[in-house]
Design a protein with these regions (language model features):
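N-terminal leader/pro-regions and domain N-caps
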Residues: 2-7
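Long protein-protein interaction modules used by eukaryotic assembly/scaffold proteins
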Residues: 8-16, 41
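Serine endopeptidase catalytic core focused on the charge-relay Asp
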Residues: 18-26, 34-35, 61, 69-203, ...
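Histidine-centered active-site/metal-ligand motif
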Residues: 58
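Conserved G/P- and acidic residue-centered "switch" motifs that form tight phosphate/ATP-binding loops
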Residues: 215
Length: 216
């Protein structure tokens, strides 16, 4: 029996943010709607440690955040679930007799229960804050290797100034270099980040050549 590979050996030189990002596909039953991006956040649920999947409100709602009456899909279909591809933890039985091979599995996450109640969470201001989260649950956290973005050591020496270089992680048009690792798109801070008004709130404009599929 071959010993299962360890995360320390396989990922020693890998940027950990690559495992905080996740590629999404919104679905209406079996119909693929739109590719998108998201990331993991380690928090709590009902007082217990938990992982959350964070993406944009418009990805899960399937509606334009600025015009919520407008569906994003050309046929007007709204998502009933999303498909994500997750890295199996190395203690899972699928790794037995495998030689340093890493395995990913598709995981379907329903967005609504049988009575039509949403299983995802939005801001109290709904589409005005284009952010939504999905509780991944204990099963997913125990079976898959997840890295919360807040578990990656922060760079406290990074200044947020206009003109500074930034990178946007995601999956342009659903593309990935290796199964689920994101593409890093280079950009720059294009607005003054230290001026806040009632209109700008905490928004910062980023100048970058992004593509559809990087929402999230």
């Amino acid at each position: 029996m071959t010993q299962a590979p360890s995360a320390e050996n396989l990922f020693a030189n890998v940027e950990p943010l690559n495992f905080s990002a996740v590629r999404l596909m919104s679905l209406r039953d079996d119909l693929e709607l739109e590719p998108a991006s998201g990331f993991f956040f380690h928090g709590t649920f009902d007082g217990h440690p938990n992982y959350w999947l964070v993406t944009n409100w418009h990805v899960l709602a399937g509606r334009n955040a600025d015009q919520p009456g407008q569906a994003l899909h050309s046929k007007g279909a709204l998502p009933s679930g999303i498909r994500v591809q997750l890295l199996l933890r190395f203690n899972q039985p699928e790794y037995l007799n495998r030689n340093a091979e890493i395995l990913f599995q598709d995981q379907f996450l329903s967005l609504y229960d049988n009575e039509g109640h949403a299983l995802w969470y939005q801001h109290v201001r709904r589409n005005d804050v284009d952010v939504a989260v999905v509780n991944l649950g204990r099963y997913v956290a125990e079976r898959f290797y997840l890295v919360g973005i807040n578990e990656v050591p922060a760079r406290n020496d990074m200044a947020i100034e206009i003109g500074n270089e930034v990178f946007i992680l995601g999956y342009p048009l659903g593309f990935t270099h290796f199964v689920n690792t994101p593409i890093w798109k280079r950009g720059s801070i294009a607005s003054e980040p230290h001026i806040e008004t009632a209109e700008t709130k905490l928004r910062v404009v980023i100048d970058a050549t992004t593509r559809g599929g990087m929402s999230g």
